[in-house]
Regions:
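Propeptide-to-catalytic entry region of secreted or membrane-anchored zinc metalloproteases
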Residues: 1-103, 110-113
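Structural recognition of the beta-strand scaffold that forms the well-ordered cores
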Residues: 1-2, 49-52, 104-109, 150-156, ...
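A short, structural micro-pattern
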Residues: 44, 101, 146-148, 201
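Intrinsically disordered, low-complexity coil segments
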Residues: 63-68, 72-77, 85-86, 118, ...
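Active-site scaffold of zinc-dependent metalloenzymes
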Residues: 116-169
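The catalytic-center signature of Zn2+-dependent metalloproteases
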Residues: 157-219
């Protein structure tokens, strides 16, 4: 879902070719096609592929697979306020834009007012019959209409930023999307998230096979 205020601004009205490039690059990361020849590669092929939707929720074919352009009333938006659902009436209006989360991963692309945030995502709900530590467990999607935009948001300010074989950029949108989709699928950060800003090496990602680390020392 591309939110735009000015169709002449490429950072708002992102062209379909760029969006396809980003999804393809994200798939390459998840399928270990980028780092497979690196000397210290410990990545794995996740046997997973993200597909651009070919049909809208009503069953009609999409003119541009996986892409919906939505005219917005402001050129940028606070991603936290858009995502958190605390303003219930506003959240319900935003939620009308998402497609059935049981069938689609909803990704919203728009310029963030906070330019230091590259992307943001909700963690998923796990079914009560298959609970997972670290996630909200319950049949939320089966019992409720979604009352807020449960989605991934990507800051389109950096939509054309990506690393190449010569130069690395920390604003790489390929990595940002792959990272946020990891959260959407249930992954926490591997570094310590103890909530006290003490930067202790606590294992807080609920995965014993990923060693924790002190992000302050690492960076």
């Amino acid at each position: 879902h591309v939110l735009y205020n000015n169709p002449a601004d490429r950072n708002q009205y992102v062209e379909k070719e760029r969006l396809t490039e980003i999804i393809n690059a994200c798939n390459s990361i998840y399928q270990n096609k980028i780092y497979k020849n690196a000397n210290n590669n410990i990545s794995q092929d996740m046997n997973l592929e993200f597909i651009m939707a070919t049909e809208a929720p009503d069953g009609t074919s999409l003119e541009e697979p996986g892409i919906e352009y939505i005219e917005w009333d402001t050129p940028s938006m606070d991603c936290t306020l858009f995502m958190d659902g605390k303003n219930e009436s506003q959240a319900k209006e935003y939620a009308k834009m998402i497609w059935n989360p049981k069938l689609y991963i909803n990704i919203f692309i728009y310029p963030f007012t906070n330019k230091s945030i590259l992307g943001i995502s909700h963690l998923p709900y796990a079914l009560s019959t298959y609970p997972l530590a670290g996630l909200n467990n319950g049949n939320y999607y089966l019992k409720n209409e979604v009352a807020y935009p449960h989605c991934v948001s990507i800051n389109s300010t950096y939509i054309y930023e990506n690393s190449n074989n010569i130069q690395y950029t920390p604003y790489d949108v390929y990595v940002t999307l792959a990272h946020e989709l990891g959260h959407y699928l249930g992954l926490h950060h591997a570094f310590s998230e103890d909530g006290d800003n003490t930067d202790l090496c606590k294992d807080t990602d609920y995965c014993d096979d990923t060693p924790t680390y002190n992000i302050t020392d690492y960076t």
